[in-house]
Amino acid sequence: MKVRNSLKSLRARHRDNRLVRRKGRVYVINKTQRRFKARQG
């Protein structure tokens, strides 16, 4: 999992990327291409 400052640009890299909030943190998850998984921090 990558840690990024801005997830909006990372989300635009693949059409299956989803922006989710869990436990006060923002994540990008992708079911088909798992290498796009990231957390904001």
Swiss-Prot record:
Keywords: Ribonucleoprotein, Ribosomal protein. Pfam families: Ribosomal_L36 (PF00444). GO terms for cellular component: ribonucleoprotein complex; ribosome. GO terms for molecular function: structural constituent of ribosome. The keyword Ribosomal protein applies. GO terms for biological process: translation. The keyword Ribonucleoprotein applies. Belongs to the bacterial ribosomal protein bL36 family. This is Large ribosomal subunit protein bL36. It comes from Nitrobacter hamburgensis (strain DSM 10229 / NCIMB 13809 / X14). The gene is rpmJ.
